[in-house]
Design a protein with these regions (language model features):
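Nuclease catalytic cores
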Residues: 1-21
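Active-site metal-binding core of divalent-cation-utilizing nuclease and nuclease-like domains
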Residues: 6-8, 31-69
């Protein structure tokens, strides 16, 4: 029996993390593959299914402020997330993050070279090749990071 190290992120996640880094100033830190239970506290009134999910789920990217308090979660979506089981997990994760007051953005490659950043309320599509609408994508990320200053964190 042998155990070997492996990469923490795939190529898509690596590109997304690099993009996020360019959108933030030195005040914020990006953490990858962080368990929900590392940055959210459990409420004893949570239903059993959400409790189980809470302890077994992680986020793709957690952005924290300089005090390491959560500001924003970015979930990297692939076509895998179109399956009903994955949608249910995404729904549970969104519910838990909403209860914790941590904003959530999704990112997804829509078509070759087009990156979609979206929440329940808004969306930005950014062209990775031409840079068109990059400032809009950056502003959306910064807006959600800034919202955390007003949220119960």
């Amino acid at each position: 029996m042998s155990i070997k190290p492996k990469r923490l992120v795939n190529a898509y996640e690596e590109r997304m993390l690099e993009f996020l880094q360019t959108c933030l100033d030195g005040t914020y830190k990006i953490h990858t593959q962080v368990s929900l239970c590392q940055f959210c506290e459990l409420d004893s009134n949570l239903d059993i299914e959400l409790k189980k999910f809470f302890f077994s789920s992680s986020v793709d990217a957690l952005i924290t402020n300089s005090d390491y308090k959560p500001c924003l979660v970015v979930d990297f979506q692939s076509s895998y997330h179109d399956y009903p089981e994955a949608r249910e997990r995404d729904r549970k994760k969104a519910t838990l993050l909403a209860l914790a007051g941590v904003p959530l953005l999704y990112s997804r490659i829509k078509e070759f070279g087009l990156l979609q950043l979206y929440s329940q309320n808004e969306e930005v599509i950014f062209n990775l090749f031409t840079g068109e609408r990059r400032e809009n994508a950056k502003a959306l990320i910064q807006k959600y990071c800034g919202l955390s200053a007003f949220i119960n964190v």
